[in-house]
Amino acid sequence: ANLTRGMQLATPERITKVIRDVLKGEVGARVKVYEQTCMRCGACAKACHFSLSHPDDASYTPVAKLDKTIFKMVRESGKLNAEQMRGIAQIAHTECNMCRRCIHYCPVGVDIAYLMSLVRRICNKLGITPTFIQDTANSHSATFNQMWVREDEWIDSLVWQEEEAREEFPGIRIPLDKEGADFMYSVIAPEPK
């Protein structure tokens, strides 16, 4: 549903504006350098599990994905249509998980994961993102976590955990925002729910 709605709003003018806004300045210069530096040697393919799982299909190599996404945006000066962006979004969200293995194989240091993250950013700004990914992005934006846990809910959960733990450990405390603490507890997001 999110892809369909995003595509309806993605006029060629809006697509061009979003791409140009994201790729302006230093970001655009960095992308252009990567595009010109990439030798298209395919060394990155040896590291990509998507490419390795499709050995007879060169379109799954990281360099092919870049050519069909971010490098295409640069070559076309952002002048793409909604259907092209749908294909780009599919590649960005289903053919690369940005594990960064490819970077270690690239002889010239092209940061492929960074480039794919830019593609995802552009898709996100256009609303051409799978619903479950968009929901996670919205949650992070609103609550700084992927489970929609508000700060007051988190504090209530910690108070409750502290009370429960006192049965076994009298006097235990879970201090919040304590400077100079010896330990920091980083919780798994679903835990407070």
List the predicted regions and their residue ranges.
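Ferredoxin-type iron-sulfur electron-transfer modules and their immediate structural context
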Residues: 1-93
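Iron-sulfur-cluster electron-transfer modules
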Residues: 28-35, 68-193
